[in-house]
Amino acid sequence: DGFFEMNINEIAKLANVSRATVSRYFNDGYVSAEKREQIRKVIEETGYKPSAQAQMLRTKKTKQIGVIIPKINSESISGMVSGISKELKQAGFWLLLANTENQEREEVEYLKLFSENQVDGIILIGTIFTPAHKRALRALQVPVVVLGQKLEGYSCVYQDDYLAAKESARMMLKDAKHPACLGVTKRDHAAGEERFRG
């Protein structure tokens, strides 16, 4: 027995039903219990799986999520990407990774690219949000989640850098016998400014 790719016509023939009935079966339309069982049996016996392209055309879903990161050589970011990848895989999605090398313009370009290539959603681990970022985000037709920063109007997952720095300084000063120093930089727009304020 040679391997051959099944199609809807062959399933209909083997199940002794019409092509339209098989189509309704795959599109969750009405099919009698008897015919539904015949089709299910053929699918099970042949190991048929609809092609990803056919499913995408039917459902308008790609099962792909674009993930935009500022740099790949960061332990914290690689840890986030690993966790995102694991969760997406368990949910049946593919991860498309874009590394921007801390280039704000690249982040905006990837937002546009992912939008044009019909991903089902975007996860953005951004550095700073410029007016160009905000325009690109507003133009998106897919859900967006921002990680690491708070951006009004979007679903965000972030830590309170201001409070974390304030509490760290308070705890250090409480037990300090000598003047303490806590190093932060304002140059890190994503977290540094809030930590400096704290």
Place the predicted regions along the sequence by residue.
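N-terminal helix-turn-helix DNA-binding module of bacterial transcription factors
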Residues: 1-63
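N-terminal helix-turn-helix/winged-helix DNA-binding helices
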Residues: 44-82, 91, 101, 113-116
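Short beta->alpha junction loops
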Residues: 96-104
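Short beta-strand-centered segments that line the small-molecule binding cleft or hinge
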Residues: 108-125, 129-163
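Bacterial carbohydrate/catabolite-sensing allosteric modules
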Residues: 1-6, 45, 86-91, 139-146, ...
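Short, surface-exposed alpha-helical segments at coil->helix boundaries
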Residues: 36, 78-82, 134, 166, ...
